[in-house]
């Protein structure tokens, strides 16, 4: 990431020409090749930008006599031939730093948190449900939640934020394995998610797996009536 605060003017040459007159601005040049120009307003929105892939060239600007004016031209061009022509009159501050790979945004409500909340409120799945343990180990990987129902029978629970066919297939494999163990069988299946895709619901119900749509806010103890059991 290259962060530059500079006095500059910007010309966009492409489908429509646009010009930003000389002023102090923030210029961001990211490792992915994108370039954006910002003013001290407009929140996060840039005044102008170029998305990757694009090329970046820097050259000195000379006057008509071939003398160096002290200004720099930054030329950013994409494969379509569109250009950002940034004229740098003066650089006030500049930082060039490798930020490395970003871990991404950790959102409130991802699967790990849903699993934790559902384990804490296991009665969401039905009256007299009890928690056996989270991350119940099997030979093919851990089951998100192992619980017992009102009949004291084991229930394997797969927790997803968005439930698709892959999640149903995964739970099916767990159930097939667990039901081979006479000490556990019969083991029932619950597919729990904030959102369950129609194809996944159809497949789950065809295999005798119960679907539970989770209300994240209700699990957090916030008043809501949106929890639906199917």
UniProtKB/Swiss-Prot annotation:
Keywords recorded for this protein, A-Z: Cytoplasm, DNA-binding, Endonuclease, Hydrolase, Nuclease
Main subcellular localisation: cytoplasm
Documented EC number(s): 3.1.-.-
InterPro entries from the UniProt entry: Endonuclease_NucS, NucS_C, NucS_N, NucS_N_sf, Restrct_endonuc-II-like, tRNA_endonuc-like_dom_sf
EC top class named in words: hydrolase
Protein localization: Cytoplasm
Pfam families for the chain: NucS_C, NucS_N
Alphabetized GO MF terms: DNA binding; single-stranded DNA endodeoxyribonuclease activity
UniProt GO cellular component terms: cytoplasm
Segments forming a coiled coil: none
Keyword DNA-binding: yes
SUPFAM superfamilies to which the protein is assigned, alphabetical: Restriction endonuclease-like (SSF52980)
Similarity section: Belongs to the NucS endonuclease family.
Function per UniProt: Cleaves both 3' and 5' ssDNA extremities of branched DNA structures.
Protein name as it appears in the record: Endonuclease NucS
Organism: Corynebacterium aurimucosum (strain ATCC 700975 / DSM 44827 / CIP 107346 / CN-1) (Corynebacterium nigricans)
